[in-house]
Amino acid sequence: MNYDANPIHILFNDENLKQRLLALIVGNNTPSGTTFNALCFHIRQQAIDDHAVADPDGTVYTNDELAPEDQLRVSRLLWELIWEHKVFLLFGRSALLGLSNGEDRFVKY
């Protein structure tokens, strides 16, 4: 068994990754939306579960982060979803909406 503490590089192509991001945002049908960190964590888990990571099978990942270049891809694809009016950014810090942690959220349009 191999252990890897490096950020995880995912192998999803842009279209597949974009659809996964949209599904996560739409599937979280709450007014408070989903944070960037939560989206990246779920994408990381999906990539591990689907064997779509750059490291060989049997690797135990000890880092919760996507590789920096994949975080940039996620960010760019989220902006595409915003421009397509499929999601929007929820700004604000309302404890009533559960927005007290300082992170803006992505919500289904």
Regions found by a protein language model. Give the residues of each.
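Short amphipathic alpha-helical interaction segments
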Residues: 65-83
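Short acidic, hydrophobic short linear motifs in intrinsically disordered regions
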Residues: 30-66
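Short, cationic-aromatic polyanion-contact patches
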Residues: 92-109
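A short, conserved structural fragment
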Residues: 82-92
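Charge-dense, low-complexity intrinsically disordered segments
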Residues: 8-11, 64-68
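Short alpha-helical segments that sit at the start of domains
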Residues: 1-45
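Sequence-pattern detector for short linear motifs
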Residues: 21-23, 47, 76, 108
